[in-house]
Amino acid sequence: MFPGKVNPRMLKKMQKMMKDFGMETEDLDVRKVIFVFDDEEWVFEEPKVQVMDILGVKTYSITGKPKKIKKEKVEEEEEVKVEITEEDVELVAKQCNVSKEEARKALEECNGDIAEAILKLEEEKEEN
């Protein structure tokens, strides 16, 4: 709670005084803290986190060294592979009267969005 070395008796006295003034502190068992900015993220692995309650207003203190990650890398990590089910493929193929291969390709291009895949195939039909 307090930086440097503090005499244990003095620490108890300080904590009592803080409590008398309506201030309470608590160490939190936190494994990771992430700050998300527009262009980067700061990831604190195993930080020391304390919450201080002063007359009902909570203030959080985070101590540790952040790992800074640029946003391009973060977005790549968040990219998720969409699962396309056989039922979705059959539905799109039947609705648009196309082969399952064409339906699957359209679903993949539309990230699994059935309605968007159907509209895409219908537009392609109109163009031909």
Swiss-Prot record:
One Pfam family from the record? NAC
PROSITE patterns xrefs? NAC_AB
Sorted alphabetically, which CDD domains does this protein's record hold?
UBA_AeNAC (cd14359)
User: One GO molecular function term?
Assistant: RNA binding
Domain of life where this protein originates: Archaea
Q: Can you supply a Gene Ontology BP term from the record? A: negative regulation of apoptotic process
Q: What keywords are annotated for this sequence in UniProt?
A: Protein transport, RNA-binding, Transport
- Domain (NAC-A/B) spans 8-75
Could you give the subunit structure recorded for this chain?
Answer: Homodimer. Interacts with the ribosome. Binds ribosomal RNA.
Function per UniProt: Contacts the emerging nascent chain on the ribosome.
NCBIfam families given for it?
archaeal-type nascent polypeptide-associated complex protein
Q: Which family does it belong to?
A: Belongs to the NAC-alpha family.
**Identification of the protein by name:** Nascent polypeptide-associated complex protein
Origin species: Methanocaldococcus jannaschii (strain ATCC 43067 / DSM 2661 / JAL-1 / JCM 10045 / NBRC 100440) (Methanococcus jannaschii)
